[in-house]
Design a protein with these regions (language model features):
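Anion-recognition interface
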Residues: 1-174
Length: 174
């Protein structure tokens, strides 16, 4: 489970970055006012799954480096499967899903509105990547202000707290 504000932020940025998909031309304000493509009511969704599969047959884990086993999503995933992670597992250094930083998303969103051929799209994609690479200091920035994130998360607080109590035995927010 990823905090809903973090999921919304990440999902919109990914759609804009990739382009030519739903929301790839929507402003952040448009998306966040009606993010109907995502299931943010985790408690309700998990209860539906639980009703079909049984609580004992589902694994609920928190998403975030601070929650991953040894800070590794790979190790955490293997642990969830019941597989011991060791040196036999080699993580390739191949192509990664690199993030954009700073205002690169807004530039890319505007470019997504233009009718371009593949060559031009790739040309501008490289330019946006270069702009972003020069602003890695903005890596932790999100589209929400602190107050906006608080308000957004408030909608899901009750369900999130139930999840934390039922699945993690904790009396805290997600």
């Amino acid at each position: 489970l990823r905090r809903q504000d973090s999921l919304a932020d990440s999902w919109w940025k990914q759609k804009v970055k990739v382009g030519r998909r739903i929301y790839s031309t929507s402003s952040w304000e448009e998306f966040v006012s009606d993010p109907s493509q995502l299931e943010f009511d985790y408690y309700g969704a998990i209860k539906k799954i639980e009703a079909v599969l049984g609580k004992e047959n589902i694994i609920i884990r928190r998403f975030g480096k601070q929650y991953f086993k040894n800070g590794s999503i790979y190790e955490d995933f293997m642990e969830a499967l019941g597989v011991r992670y060791d040196s036999r597992f080699v993580i390739s250094e191949g192509k990664r899903n690199n993030s954009l930083f700073g205002n690169s998303h807004e530039i890319k969103r505007i470019l997504n509105m233009l009718n371009m051929n593949k060559h031009d799209r790739l040309f501008f994609k490289r330019i946006v990547r270069e702009i972003s690479d020069n602003h890695t200091d903005l890596k932790g920035e999100t589209m929400f202000s602190a107050e906006e994130a608080r308000q957004f998360m408030e909608k899901y607080r009750e369900g999130n707290r139930k999840l934390m109590q039922e699945y993690f035995g904790k009396d805290e927010d997600l």
